[in-house]
Amino acid sequence: MAALRQIAFYGKGGIGKSTTSQNTLAALVELGQKILIVGCDPKADSTRLILNTKMQDTVLSLAAEAGSVEDLELEDVMKIGYKGIKCTEAGGPEPGVGCAGRGVITAINFLEENGAYEDVDYVSYDVLGDVVCGGFAMPIRENKAQEIYIVMSGEMMALYAANNIAKGILKYASSGGVRLGGLICNERQTDRELDLAEALAARLNSKLIHFVPRANIVQHAELRRQTVIEYAPDSQQAQEYRQLANKIHANSGNGTIPTPITMEELEGMLLDFGIMKTDEQALAELAEKEAAKAAAATA
């Protein structure tokens, strides 16, 4: 059996990280790969499309009901979904109480100790990436996830989060084997999005793994709690996810140590690509619009 590949999908909240990861994993299982998902996002939506259900019970919530995590059995926290994909959700505490990362640590330790990592080809961590705090960095810090894939778009905050995640990877790259596998751009139809994604990947000493086009069929599938792979297997969007899965499958051992950039460099990139305008440019455009309005009013 080939060596276990531990991959992680990081990205800012709302970027479509969980949707992208579940569609990619559904395509990977078509390649004959055995997969375990460890959801590390407090929203606990990392397995919804694979299980065709509202939301899976989390390790932390089940442990609270049972008394402690030691009172749980593996079958309590692990459900089997699409084509045999094993699904677990770490969960998090009540809002405003405690550290959400604690659930990640507790869940991973429990799963490892109870044999969840046996007889799988991939373990996939789906991790919130707005803030790479100690808890959410746990799959990186504890040398669990070896390949990190950052889901981003051409929007400013998605780029900012991607650069922040790269900083987190760099911090632990020397002490462990974690590497940046690449960037996945979820199209938001912003100006020059593909060019910007490729440029950021190059600046981070990485590559753009795949550019996922925006398509309404993704939302249609989500409303039915399904991946596009299951809902519309013959669609063009399903083919996009299969291409992404194939690229990740072929990317073993090709990860890099990232080279994060400064905020000034990031803003400079946005200016270079015409995404972010200087104050002078913005004022000139505003003056032009006002002049056009005035001319129209007097015509």
Swiss-Prot record:
Database matches in CDD domains: NifH
List of residues that carry ADP-ribosylarginine: 102
Pfam family, one: Fer4_NifH
Biological process per Gene Ontology, one example term: nitrogen fixation
Record field: catalytic activity: N2 + 8 reduced [2Fe-2S]-[ferredoxin] + 16 ATP + 16 H2O = H2 + 8 oxidized [2Fe-2S]-[ferredoxin] + 2 NH4(+) + 16 ADP + 16 phosphate + 6 H(+)
Binding site for [4Fe-4S] cluster: 99, 133
Binding site for ATP: 11-18
Protein keywords: 4Fe-4S, ADP-ribosylation, ATP-binding, Iron, Iron-sulfur, Metal-binding, Nitrogen fixation, Nucleotide-binding, Oxidoreductase
Domain of life: Bacteria
Gene Ontology terms, MF aspect: 4 iron, 4 sulfur cluster binding; ATP binding; metal ion binding; nitrogenase activity
InterPro entries in alphabetical order: NifH/chlL_CS, NifH/frxC, Nitrogenase_Fe_NifH, P-loop_NTPase
Post-translational modification: The reversible ADP-ribosylation of Arg-102 inactivates the nitrogenase reductase and regulates nitrogenase activity.
Cofactor note: Binds 1 [4Fe-4S] cluster per dimer.
NCBIfam families in alphabetical order: nifH
Function: The key enzymatic reactions in nitrogen fixation are catalyzed by the nitrogenase complex, which has 2 components: the iron protein and the molybdenum-iron protein.
Similarity-based family: Belongs to the NifH/BchL/ChlL family.
Protein name: Nitrogenase iron protein
Biological source species: Rhodopseudomonas palustris (strain HaA2)
